[in-house]
Amino acid sequence: MPPKPRNGYLPTAAANTMSQPQTPLRALLLHGIHMHAWVMLPLAWQLRRHNIHSRCFGYYSIAQTLPQHSRRLAEAVRRHYQQHQEPLHFICHSLGGLVLRRFAADYPELVRGRSVTLATPHLGSETANRLHRYAPALIGGAYQNGLDGNLPP
């Protein structure tokens, strides 16, 4: 008999056999453009249930440039995680993934874990190109060397 859907999803064998890590993992969550750190809280709460301690890093997505976000992220990582020996993982949505890429290029010594980017425009964004052309204030500092696709590898 096939498994029954639960909450709209089919259970997988991996989900049934996954064990929680013995020592808590640490993760830093980065939000996308025009968002606030609190939008990542539901994900942080779910991660906590699986013994992953996380913080939500907030930044002014369009008021500053990616290098400025990268610098602030480096300050936060040094302040909150430098004393820990275990890896720090990153989970990023949209522009947050571009901030992480810039951070990894600028501060490779601070990247000691894995990264997941969700809906990040790694190759640039056609929508951002149009907005930059017709309403540049809507994307501000996030465009140049970020949403335009000109980012370090």
Residue ranges and their predicted role:
Residues 27-38, 48-60, 64-153:
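Serine-dependent carboxylesterase/thioesterase catalytic core
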Residues 1-25, 41, 45-52:
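Alpha/beta-hydrolase fold catalytic core
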